[in-house]
Amino acid sequence: MNKIIEKMIYESRWLLFPVYIGLSFGFILLTLKFFHEIIQFLPKIFDMPESDLILIVLSMIDIALVGGLLVMVMFSGYENFILKMSDDCNQKRLNWMGKMDVNSIKNKVASSIVAISSVHLLRIFMEADRTRDNKIMWCVIIHLAFVLSAFGMAYIDKMSKTKS
């Protein structure tokens, strides 16, 4: 009976596969949005103020950071939880693949969230004259919560490695 339960639990990892396929679809949508942003502002590039251009570039950076986060979660999650990718399938293997454990992934995700939040906060500061003070305050508080969480997770990870 135990063997059957263990096998069921082990094989249930494949339920994550459609999730990673869904993330791939999300990445495709994000890429489409990125190019939509470029196509939308290209005709206006010479008429727009520099501050608007900076906001558009910040939006593109935001999309790139989220895309990088998606790729990292898809690859490392697939390799850690479903199946190791074979070397013959991908000749140009990313150097971090196969080297990230769950804690490393969590720390990278937390760092990425802080970076994304920083870009979002910078965009809000650039539009401060059009943004309510209350919204700015809450965005700063939420950003600080992300930063503290990232530091806390990194500290806990470091402490658990020194005890081992």
UniProtKB/Swiss-Prot annotation:
InterPro entries: UPF0114, UPF0114_bac. Its main location: membrane. The keyword Nucleotidyltransferase does not apply. It is a multi-pass membrane protein. The chain crosses the membrane at residues 15-35, 53-73, 136-156. Pfam families: UPF0114. Keywords: Cell membrane, Membrane, Transmembrane, Transmembrane helix. One of its GO terms (cellular component) is plasma membrane. It is found in: Cell membrane. HAMAP family: UPF0114. Belongs to the UPF0114 family. PANTHER family: UPF0114 PROTEIN YQHA (PTHR38596:SF1). This is UPF0114 protein BCI_0033. It comes from Baumannia cicadellinicola subsp. Homalodisca coagulata. The lineage of its organism: Bacteria, Pseudomonadati, Pseudomonadota, Gammaproteobacteria, Candidatus Palibaumannia.
